[in-house]
Amino acid sequence: MADQLIRATAADGGIRAVGVITTNLTEEARQRHRLSYVATAALGRTMAAGLLLASSMKQEKSRVNIRIRGNGPLGGLLVDAGLDGTVRGYVQNPSVELAPNAQGKLDVGGAVGQDGFLYVVRDVGFGYPYSSTVELVSGEIGEDVTHYLVTSEQTPSALLLGVFVGKDGVTAAGGLLLQVMPKAARDEALVAALESRLGHLTGFTPLLRSGKSLKDIFQELLGDFGLAILPEVQLLRFDCRCSFPRVLGALKILGQDELEDMIEKDNGAEATCDFCGEVYQADRHHLAQLIGEIQREKAEKL
């Protein structure tokens, strides 16, 4: 099944629902960064969360950055997701592995840590980005992002995230975001019924692994709440904006002396993109061209 995002409403627009399947892009991230099992789960959950948060933005170039910094051995995570369905991200310590938790599941909370902060930056592509910071609740990602939504955006929300990774890689990943809009927030019976239904779920990936589609899951959860599934299915993908010209631009900033030193000692330079793991090689000729540009720019200022 292709990675995808679908939207729906229920209760006469009182409930907003968004679901994502991110199996393939999570597997791509696992391979690119050579992630451990628990690092795959942590990054996969965060990428799904980023796409779900970005889905509510309006401007075409809108993006969401989620940065998590806990006291666990994973170090930190950074995810960049766009309204256009693209996402990228990385983990500071990708090889960290932990024993399963008390429930026999991947110990994402232990890897991330419970003491720390979650930072969210919403950027619409112009003006000043909106940023918010909340303390981590559990390090399990889903609970932490839900805490952000309730605290910073003051929207009653339920967020389900899941990644199933085994010896053959990622076989199921995705998430579901349900939000009660202001028009329905005072309907205590509706909120209670929704909370009860969500409380009976054992997680998101079991639903995917049982063969259910996002529409099936929406129908199961919201079918008797006047569910209306929007027809558009948005495709999602792991995508990075890094490029060789950007690498050359970054090298140029180092200045002539540093570039000459690289030529003399290493016969060139190598750069690796943190977000996607792509390795770029700049040989001595590329660096010499940069030095020439620097010299010409200096001469023009005289």
Swiss-Prot record:
A molecular function (GO) term: unfolded protein binding
GO cellular component terms given for this protein: cytoplasm
CDD domains: Hsp33
Compartment(s) where it occurs, according to its Swiss-Prot or TrEMBL record: Cytoplasm
Disulfide links within the chain: 240-242, 273-276
Transmembrane among keywords: no
Changes after translation: Under oxidizing conditions two disulfide bonds are formed involving the reactive cysteines. Under reducing conditions zinc is bound to the reactive cysteines and the protein is inactive.
Function: Redox regulated molecular chaperone. Protects both thermally unfolding and oxidatively damaged proteins from irreversible aggregation. Plays an important role in the bacterial defense system toward oxidative stress.
HAMAP family listed in its UniProt record: HslO (MF_00117)
Protein name: 33 kDa chaperonin
